[in-house]
Amino acid sequence: MNPYVRAIITSGLILGPIITMSSNHWITAWCGLEMNSLTMIPLIANKYQPRAIEASTKYFLTQAMASYLMLSAALMNMWYYGQWDMQLLTDNISCTTMTVAMSIKLAAAPFHFWFPEVLQGATVLTALLLTTWQKLAPLTILVQCSQNLDTTLLIALGMTSILIGGWGGLNQTQIRKIMAFSSIAHLGWMYAILTLSPKILLLTFYLYVAMTATTFLMINVLQTNNMSAIMISWTKTPFMNTMMLLNLMSLAGLPPLTGFAPKWLILQEFTKQRLSMFASMMITSSLLSLYFYLRMSYYTIITLPPTTCNYPLQWRLMTNIHTALATITPLATALMPLLPTLKAIP
């Protein structure tokens, strides 16, 4: 890619969410979202392959439809109440339309149809951006409108996302599609807690970003795109495969790893609000996600491919030092003891 084009795309990726997060007007927030979406399209189509072009087209169409619904909700609210303020979204139809629009942008079930295919057509690093950075601006809009949104609708969308995210990842062999359904399942937990405690939602999102970024960076280093390739990655970097196992267990939410902390806080908040039945249903639905995380862990560290060599470790060149990966891996696996401190942050 041309360096000037890359600089423009990088600037758009950074400025788009910042404009949306710092704005209090619907038009300004919409401009930030559009800037963010339009700069992602050339990144997805950068491979110049039919699958990448198809993925970029799907991404453009779904984001355009979501932007149309967002503007429609803002215009309806302005028509009835004369307000462009994001925190004064008081019309019920506008609130529902805005929730649907942001759900399409975030790929929450049942509006997730585009997300696995787009991730499969993109590169690993582009998929990392789609599952982390691109979710920041829509989530910020939902947090700003959280006082006026329908709690029942959000809990229903959250439980549907947890269930479909776990169900869809069961029979997948492509790692990027598995991570797509994993993202949908984690988004369900964020939706469920959105109106009850936005502070816990933001903490959940930050920890989700750390765990997902670690997984994608490891996949990029190991050059593994499917289950059969992940089995032979142990012979290249044994230590990184061990960390991959811990990170997958953290994504599954097993104690005492980092991923258990946000789920614990969400279930605790549901219990305080006397929503124990919904909490039980969320825990039961998350068992589906646990299964495919355990399957990936089994392929990562426990199995070896058939080989005729007595010594399975392959000869290899010295690998590069990955500073970013070394920095965020402890955050993705070992933050559970710091949970009281994280919860106390205002």
UniProtKB/Swiss-Prot annotation:
Gene Ontology molecular function: NADH dehydrogenase (ubiquinone) activity
Catalytic activity entry: a ubiquinone + NADH + 5 H(+)(in) = a ubiquinol + NAD(+) + 4 H(+)(out)
Known EC number: 7.1.1.2
PANTHER family, alphabetized: NADH-UBIQUINONE OXIDOREDUCTASE CHAIN 2 (PTHR46552:SF1)
Lineage: Eukaryota, Metazoa, Chordata, Craniata, Vertebrata
One GO BP annotation of this record: mitochondrial electron transport, NADH to ubiquinone
Functional description taken from the UniProt entry: Core subunit of the mitochondrial membrane respiratory chain NADH dehydrogenase (Complex I) that is believed to belong to the minimal assembly required for catalysis. Complex I functions in the transfer of electrons from NADH to the respiratory chain. The immediate electron acceptor for the enzyme is believed to be ubiquinone.
Species annotation: Pelomedusa subrufa (African side-necked turtle)
CC annotations in GO: mitochondrial inner membrane
Topology within the bilayer: Multi-pass membrane protein
Enzyme class: translocase
Top-rank taxon, per record: Eukaryota
Protein's recorded name: NADH-ubiquinone oxidoreductase chain 2
Keywords annotated in UniProt: Electron transport, Membrane, Mitochondrion, Mitochondrion inner membrane, NAD, Respiratory chain, Translocase, Transmembrane, Transmembrane helix, Transport, Ubiquinone
Keyword Transmembrane listed: yes
rRNA-binding found in the keyword field: no
Family per similarity comment: Belongs to the complex I subunit 2 family.
Localization per record: Mitochondrion inner membrane
InterPro entries (UniProt xref): Complex_I_Subunit_2 (IPR050175), NADH_DH_su2_C (IPR010933), NADH_UbQ_OxRdtase_chain2 (IPR003917), ND/Mrp_TM (IPR001750)
TM region(s), chain numbering: 7-27, 59-79, 93-115, 151-171, 178-198, 200-220, 242-262, 275-294, 325-345
